[in-house]
Regions:
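Conserved beta-propeller blade signature
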Residues: 42-46, 99-103, 141-144, 180-183, ...
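Bacterial Sec-dependent N-terminal signal peptides
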Residues: 1, 5-43
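Hydrophobic/aromatic beta-strand positions that recur at structurally equivalent sites within the blades
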Residues: 58-63, 112-114, 153, 191-194, ...
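Asp-box/WD-like beta-propeller blade repeats and closely related beta-sheet repeat scaffolds
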Residues: 120-177
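Post-signal peptide N-terminal segment of secreted/secretory-pathway proteins
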Residues: 46-132, 136-139
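A short beta-strand motif characteristic of beta-propeller blades
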Residues: 24-26, 67-85, 119-126, 158-165, ...
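Repeated scaffold domains used in trafficking and secretory/extracellular systems
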Residues: 28-34, 85-92, 128-139, 168-178, ...
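Short glycine/acidic-enriched loop and turn motifs that connect beta-strands
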Residues: 49-54, 107-109, 149-150, 188-189, ...
Length: 270
């Protein structure tokens, strides 16, 4: 199965090929006017929305032509009604298998919906801490990071079945490559977790903010002055200085998913 990550705010991640989106061909509709979701190719944008005024939202951009998209506003509320909402300050979303997972800092911290219709499947308000991110492992299991560690999520029962032992403090972005999940810890660096045993097998010390998995499977972790590239099989790593003008900023202050992602079509990072 292939997971698709969606970052909060204004970061866009397309699920088709890597083509520039031409802004003047995206016709936005008026605020607060929800539009129904149409099954078609396109991409999602998760919004933290306006803290103190509204909960998080998700918009859907449906492709009408190779360079033309139609925006569908507040799509989750359209599918489920105005009383069904995401949590407070939604910062992360991921498509895994048949579901889409929305992670928020407070309130409805984990919302699971059908990836095609956006119909609600489950809402969890307690996951062990304030929500951060989700990574799918297989058809039965995923991990949810939060401010106090990493929760193990059973996809079939939509329930938290435990916490990763030894993972403490705020955990941000996570990525699956091979048989390991790599998770960024604000305090301790990178946790390497065996997905069969749900045990931490290595901790890579350092100060890092976010990570992504490249098309060839390498783990790229953003630090203060450069990348840490990790081989997912040997777990060997090397430091690579940022190209000039391409540093990745910290995402810990008011946590967000960061400004780093990888192409699914080419072996490049954005």
């Amino acid at each position: 199965l292939l997971g698709l990550v969606l970052f909060a705010g204004f970061s866009l991640l397309a699920c088709s090929d890597d083509k520039d989106i031409i802004d003047d061909k995206i016709e936005l509709i008026a605020d607060d006017e929800p539009q129904p979701v149409t099954e078609s190719s396109g991409f999602w944008v998760v919004n933290e929305d306006w803290f103190g005024h509204d909960n998080g939202t998700v918009n859907y951009f449906r492709q009408q032509a190779p360079d033309s998209y139609e925006a569908m506003y507040r799509a989750y509320r359209v599918a489920n009604g105005e009383n069904e909402q995401l949590g407070v300050t939604t910062q992360f979303g991921a498509v895994w298998g048949e579901n889409i997972y929305f992670i928020s800092k407070q309130g409805n911290r984990l919302v699971v919906a059908d990836a095609e219709t956006l119909k609600k499947k489950a809402v969890l308000t307690e996951i062990g801490g304030d929500g951060r991110s989700f990574v799918g492992i297989n058809e039965n299991k995923g991990y949810v990071s939060h401010t106090s560690g990493i929760a193990v999520f059973d996809i079939k029962s939509f329930s938290i079945t435990g916490q990763i032992e030894g993972a403490s403090g705020q955990i941000g972005m996570m990525g699956l490559s091979g048989n390991h999940v790599f998770a960024v810890s604000q305090q301790n660096g990178i946790y390497v977790i065996d997905t069969e045993t749900d045990q931490i097998v290595r901790t890579i010390a350092g100060t890092y903010s976010t990570l992504t998995i490249s098309k060839e499977g390498d783990v790229w972790v953003a630090g203060s002055n450069g990348f840490l590239r990790i081989d997912p099989l040997s777990l060997d790593s090397e430091e690579i200085v940022y190209p000039e003008g391409a540093a990745v900023g910290s995402s810990w202050g008011a946590w967000n998913a960061g400004s780093l992602c990888a192409s699914t079509q080419k072996n490049v990072l954005y």
